[in-house]
Amino acid sequence: HTYAPSIETVPFQGSDPLAVSKEIRQYLTVHPDTYAIYTCSARFTYHISQCIRQLGIQDRIQVIGNDLFTESRQALSDGILRGVIDKKISKQSALAVKTLFDYLLKKDYPRSSCLVMEPEIVLRSNFQSHSDLQK
């Protein structure tokens, strides 16, 4: 940690969000001075948000989640999440399907072998105006 030597990273690994959430809940109980959590997937964002809500510690911990979906929007609104890294999964999927459709049916070859979809950082302060939230 060259940039922040006083920060200790504690990775939690596993593919079962419920099991990892339980492990994090236990960790937070033993280490109440934990300052922040970053979750790298939408599934884990949901479960960690639920854990923080149930523990009632949203005022003392900074949680950054991944992807905008109904529950992460609610967690932002409720102050459970401080921010979300929106990878625009639905737009990525739509672009992939459109590109494949155009290629297979229209013989329209993609202009590039790499299609870039820039992620966005959505914070509590700007999520109400975020374009993906407009219904």
Q: Model-found features: residue ranges?
A:
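Short, well-ordered alpha-helices that flank and scaffold nucleotide-derived cofactor binding pockets
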Residues: 50-54, 78, 98, 102
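Short beta-strand elements at the ligand-binding edges of bilobed clamshell
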Residues: 78-90
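Hinge/cleft segment of the Venus flytrap/periplasmic-binding protein
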Residues: 88-135
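Flexible loop/hinge segments that line or gate small-molecule binding clefts
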Residues: 69-77, 81
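Residue-level recognition of short, well-ordered coil/turn positions
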Residues: 32, 57, 80, 107-108
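Hydrophobic alpha-helical
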Residues: 12-71
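Conserved beta-strand scaffold positions in the cores of enzyme catalytic domains, especially
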Residues: 7-11, 63, 84, 121
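Short helix-loop-beta junction
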Residues: 1-4
